[in-house]
Amino acid sequence: MPRYVVERDFPDGLHVPVNADGAKAMGGVIDTNLTDGVTWVHTYVSTDNNKRNYGVYDATNPEAIRRVGAKNNLPVGKITEVRVLDPYFYR
């Protein structure tokens, strides 16, 4: 399945509580993503009060990512298909 990096901008920052409420919210995002076959792998958050993040997703196509973004009320900016290249590639 193709892998994508998704840029998301949060003008007021992204604030996810580190407690049961945050876990419930993230669980809801995961469940909603599955309705379109999208798997959230992980996300890198910026150091500027979490105003931009870069999520890594497996999905059939960018449109599926946009659909679940809308369902989850999350902004979706640039979507780039990526592949992994690590330093052990040549060994």
Model-derived features with residue positions:
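Short S/T/G/P-rich N-terminal loop/turn motif that feeds into the first structured element of a domain
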Residues: 1-35, 39-42, 46-50, 62-63, ...
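An amphipathic, aromatic/His-enriched active-site/gating alpha helix that lines ligand/cofactor pockets
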Residues: 58-85
